[in-house]
Amino acid sequence: MEEMALAQQVPNLGLARFSVQDKSILITGATGSLGRVAARALADAGARLTLAGGNSAGLAELVNGAGIDDAAVVTCRPDSLADAQQMVEAALGRYGRLDGVLVASGSNHVAPITEMAVEDFDAVMDANVRGAWLVCRAAGRVLLEQGQGGSVVLVSSVRGGLGNAAGYSAYCPSKAGTDLLAKTLAAEWGGHGIRVNALAPTVFRSAVTEWMFTDDPKGRATREAMLARIPLRRFAEPEDFVGALIYLLSDASSFYTGQVMYLDGGYTAC
């Protein structure tokens, strides 16, 4: 009897801590490279998903191709508070609650600062900072009202902490803003058991970075320079981020908040 009582008091320290089974998770930017992989992985792990994105055809392809036709789908980007609220309400309408959020939506525009249009700068800041802020505002109200904690993950970049000579005067500051938004909300919501972290990858293959993987001289030069600084001597694939995502959205990371998790093959170690 004493052994049984002791066993009941000891918390589960195995793989059950990493479970996202039946958690209601909202993914914005679900049709992007990272969003698609996250959706498939979380669905395989038993999460209940709400997928948001501006590409209706891409959402349909994701849902059908990944076999997650029970997901709630919202065709919009977080361009306004109404859009963000629509995403959150879709999760509540389908599952009755919200447990986690992955903000994988974002944008970039590469140009020297002397040639970049103000409108292009604004578009990057709106997509990467304002959009994340809007989603956090809408989701945070629900998480606070539920009173049962939760986890929010903002997709950032190693460029949030590093400059770049290749025309990133909009992107780098926007990702620094993403990092500080995560830290600020972690401090603001910590007393309510809501964790907020940023996930900061280096370059990985996607529609945005495809130019780097061509035989174009600029692409080849950029690729070789990047690889020379990555100790693992390879670029990431979206699948490399699955383990970190599941960790951050599961109870395994219950004491991890306000952090920028670098997934960069050692890039920032050099």
From Swiss-Prot:
The keyword Metal-binding does not apply. One of its GO terms (cellular component) is cytosol. Keywords: Oxidoreductase. NADP(+) binds at residues 30-55. The keyword rRNA processing does not apply. The active site is at 171 (proton acceptor). Belongs to the short-chain dehydrogenases/reductases (SDR) family. This is Uncharacterized oxidoreductase Rv1714.
